[in-house]
């Protein structure tokens, strides 16, 4: 069969989920292509490929773009349309929003998609395929979840070539990304993992990780085919139940490229930090989220002591690692003084980059349910009019419109202010303006530049210009689309 994966924006990072499914399908003998709809000649190229399947990976917010694009494409392309990704996993009822959505994949797609396509290709009945809600002759059939993939080492390595054939800039960028594990045992209220673990109750362990050797073998293959000078390990929490010493030994000997990974402060100790340093880790991402005890532990359910985070940051910096924190403001019931605690915590610890997000209560998360229960959502908010991105606006109720604007603008200057705290008086003046696209652009470009100071990757001028152009297209093609709750 001929499968077309379709992305409604110019991807600025590799879509690893799609890349993993591509190789599974190729191994089954299918023909697979990846398309980005804003690119020149998209429809003509897609028609020339003549796909049997249109496939979309959706997140909440992007689901609207995918659905609308699919409806437009189906006017001239006769194909079966299937959707997967986080939005579909937590809201499979999405299939009911369009008669042209033929299938929704819930959870892991590795064997779900190969089994479904095998049955379709062989003209077998497929209405009882695990992990799928499917529409056949106008009727929707709902199926159970299959067990999790336990042996991640048995899965094929991601196919990046199909992605790079459409997005040459991703091929050329010196930064590559990899997934070393699946699953997270923590129950943060704003994150999908708690609900995901509930969906998979009795279907396998919460966390599975690849062996260090398997990770290294994939990295060696990437390095051979697509030379890179920096690696991002994008696991929710890197190294859960992994042999740090073995990884450090193999990575330093076989790969030797500086990398960044996500860590949880209560899981760190001096031995693990030294292993990370030995392996070649130069920076870590750590979720602070909030320095206010009530917001952090009661609202966001982080269950972390502030001292634990402080000690972890201190230990990391003492070992020469750069610290990249993630922070959330505009939380339900949060005052500006509480948000300033988070700002001041980052300033106090001289973090290298303090990324900031506006709280978006995604459907299916605990914090969404709490917002509904306690009337923290703005009137009329639903799945299809939630803010396009947590970098834009907020759908949380504030004490006043003025207070809401204050939070939205503070977000745009949060990371800049942490690096330049003496300019806080100026930032407070800017916060009095109405939220606007200029502030959004400043935030996106400053944060992008600041990340380069974390990873410190050298790029030749042609690649640098390409990266800038790719990010500009992504900003204007996705973030700055009109949104009824972003005020833009």
Predicted segments with their positions:
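Catalytic cores of alpha/beta
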Residues: 92-99, 272, 333-348
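Conserved strand-turn element in the central/C-terminal portion of the radical SAM core barrel
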Residues: 238, 291-296, 300-302, 313-338, ...
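Residue-level signal for short, function-critical loop segments
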Residues: 9-10, 60, 237, 265, ...
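Cofactor-binding loop segments of dinucleotide-utilizing enzymes, especially the Rossmann-like FAD-
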Residues: 8, 37, 86, 236, ...
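Glycine-rich beta-alpha loop elements in corrinoid/cobalamin-binding modules
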Residues: 2, 10, 17, 21-24, ...
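Radical SAM [4Fe-4S] cluster-binding motif and immediate context
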Residues: 157-324, 344
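C-terminal accessory regions of radical SAM enzymes
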Residues: 2-13, 17, 22, 133, ...
């Amino acid at each position: 069969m001929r499968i077309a994966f379709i992305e409604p924006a110019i991807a600025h990072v590799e879509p690893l989920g799609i890349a993993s499914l591509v190789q599974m399908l190729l191994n089954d003998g299918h023909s697979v292509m990846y398309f980005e709809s804003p690119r020149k000649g998209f429809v003509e190229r897609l028609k020339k490929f003549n796909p049997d399947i249109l496939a979309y990976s959706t997140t909440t917010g992007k689901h609207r773009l995918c659905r609308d694009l699919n409806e437009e494409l189906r006017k001239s392309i006769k194909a079966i349309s299937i959707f997967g990704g986080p939005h579909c996993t937590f809201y499979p009822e999405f299939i009911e929003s369009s008669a042209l959505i033929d299938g929704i994949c819930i959870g892991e797609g590795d064997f779900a998609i190969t089994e479904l396509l095998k049955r379709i290709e062989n003209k077998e009945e497929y209405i009882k395929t695990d992990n799928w809600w499917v529409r056949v002759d106008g009727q929707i059939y709902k199926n159970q979840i299959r067990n999790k993939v336990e042996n991640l080492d048995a899965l094929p390595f991601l196919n990046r070539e199909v992605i790079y054939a459409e997005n040459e800039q991703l091929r050329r960028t010196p930064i590559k990304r990899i997934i070393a594990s699946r699953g997270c045992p923590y129950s943060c209220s704003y994150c999908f993992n708690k609900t995901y673990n509930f969906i998979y109750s009795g279907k396998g362990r919460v966390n599975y990780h690849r062996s260090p050797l398997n990770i290294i073998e994939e990295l060696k293959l990437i390095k051979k085919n697509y030379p890179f000078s920096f690696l991002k390990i994008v696991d929710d929490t890197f190294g859960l139940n992994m042999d740090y010493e073995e990884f450090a030994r193999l990575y330093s000997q076989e790969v030797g490229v500086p990398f960044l990974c996500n860590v949880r402060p209560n899981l760190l100790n001096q031995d693990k930090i030294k292993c990370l340093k030995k392996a070649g880790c130069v920076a870590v991402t750590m979720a602070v989220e909030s320095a206010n005890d009530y917001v952090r532990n009661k609202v966001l359910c982080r269950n972390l002591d502030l001292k634990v985070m402080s000690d972890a940051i201190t230990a990391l910096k003492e070992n020469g690692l750069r610290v990249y924190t993630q922070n959330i403001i505009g939380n339900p019931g949060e005052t500006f003084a509480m948000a300033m605690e988070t700002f001041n915590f980052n300033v106090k610890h001289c973090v290298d980059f303090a990324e900031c997000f506006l709280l978006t209560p995604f459907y299916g998360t605990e914090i969404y349910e709490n917002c509904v229960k306690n009337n923290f959502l703005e009137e009329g908010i639903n799945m299809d009019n939630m803010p396009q991105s947590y970098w834009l606006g907020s759908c949380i109720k504030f004490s006043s419109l003025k207070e809401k604007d204050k939070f939205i603008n503070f977000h745009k200057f949060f990371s800049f202010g942490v690096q330049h705290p003496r300019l806080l008086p100026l930032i407070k003046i800017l916060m009095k303006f109405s939220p606007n696209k200029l502030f959004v652009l400043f935030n996106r470009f400053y944060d992008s530049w600041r990340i380069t100071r974390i990873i410190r990757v050298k790029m030749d001028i042609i690649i640098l210009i390409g990266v800038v152009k790719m990010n500009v297209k992504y900003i204007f093609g996705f973030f700055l689309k009109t949104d009824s709750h972003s005020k833009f």
